[in-house]
């Protein structure tokens, strides 16, 4: 996927996920990083849609931050500066997001596609999180279609 396939907001979310990875000294961007980046933009579409669904985006973001803090850290000589990897699980979510965008006949991958990709291809930990908040594609799509 090329950078041109993403909207400005989705590029910002990916950059925020990378920055979070650096701040927490993780070696790779995980689904937790990306989900947190999507939820932490208070004026963003994803928090607005979750609020519309009766969810509390700030509470979910706080839980994600706790999950990120527990991820393995890489410090010292083992860490290559400015070298951040994307986990296979994020890659799977991005591919799912691209496929969703194509099915929706959208030219660009936007934040809602990224979020739906995370819902469609979650890791076990993320599936548990989404289940705990009763968030899935079936509940998210009606909120998305209402905007």
Label each residue range with its predicted role.
Residues 1-147:
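Histone-fold recognition with a strong bias for associated Lys/Arg-rich disordered tails
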């Amino acid at each position: 996927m090329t950078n041109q396939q993403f909207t400005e907001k989705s590029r910002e979310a990916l950059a925020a996920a990378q920055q979070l990875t650096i701040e927490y000294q993780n070696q790779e961007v995980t689904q937790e990083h990306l989900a947190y980046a999507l939820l932490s933009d208070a004026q963003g579409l994803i928090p607005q849609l979750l609020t519309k669904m009766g969810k509390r985006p700030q509470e979910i973001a706080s839980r994600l931050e706790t999950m990120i803090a527990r991820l393995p850290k890489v410090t010292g000589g083992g860490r290559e500066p400015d070298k951040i990897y994307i986990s296979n699980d994020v890659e799977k979510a991005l591919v799912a997001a691209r496929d969703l965008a194509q099915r929706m006949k959208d030219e660009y991958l936007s934040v809602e596609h990224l979020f739906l990709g995370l819902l469609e291809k979650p890791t076990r930990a993320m599936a548990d999180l989404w289940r705990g908040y009763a968030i899935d594609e079936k509940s998210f799509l009606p909120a998305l279609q209402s905007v």
